[in-house]
Amino acid sequence: MEGILNNGKKIIGVVSAKGGVGKTTTVINIGAAAANMFKKSVLILDTNLNSGNLGLNLGLTYHPISLYNIMKDPLSILHSVHKHKTGLHVIPSSLVPDTRKINPVLLKKKLKSLSNYDLILLDSAPGVGEDAKISLRAADTLFLIVTPDFPTIGTAIKTIELAKKMKVPVEGVIINKVRHKRYEVTRKEIERVLGLPIISMVPDDQAIYEAAAARMPAVLYRPKAKASISYKKLSAHIFGKRVQSGSFFNNFINAFRI
């Protein structure tokens, strides 16, 4: 299997046209799967500078040095990395008054210099504004997150058009919160409207909400859940691998039980 990360690519921007579709959840889970299933060194960054909650979703409630600090001051980007118990390296965001102070070209240069990471995931701000453009400019390729409803699919077209304008490839679409109801937009219709391949369909799974409450990735908290399996397969796809059956995740989660 050929993976996504080739020809020097290692920075994936996870983007969407609107909030609440599951970008942060996707970043955390495919990152955690890569770090633990495939023993990859993974860095996840919150580039949603005005309302990011990547750190909060992992229980990082206090982070004096954030992405904004390293872009504003001449600090090494590694100074802001939080080493999480899941094996993920995390750079959270903080509220800033003016996103124009962030130089996405400089950010990409800094990220490219981190040769010790196999995969870098950017949790983007939603929409097509200046804050959302940070991830697009810094990424090598993009994952577009949608939910199977017409308003979300319609607005996703704007994100695709922006990516084309900025000459950033969109690897494919992740359909999140799938319930397989008659009122949902079908996979075939989403592919037709957006003109992009569907690389994953993630079910609307109770395990995601339980894991979020525990401040843990679902792939570790509930490894056998349907959504967790979808995220593990997506992570495997990134590296051109297959998900192997076994007890690794079952054993690993015991280390996090309270």
Q: Which ranges hold each PLM region?
A:
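Solvent-exposed alpha-helical segments within well-ordered globular domains of core cellular machineries
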Residues: A32, Y68-N69, H79, V105, ...
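Short, well-ordered alpha-helices that flank and scaffold nucleotide-derived cofactor binding pockets
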Residues: I28, A32-N36, R137, K158-E161, ...
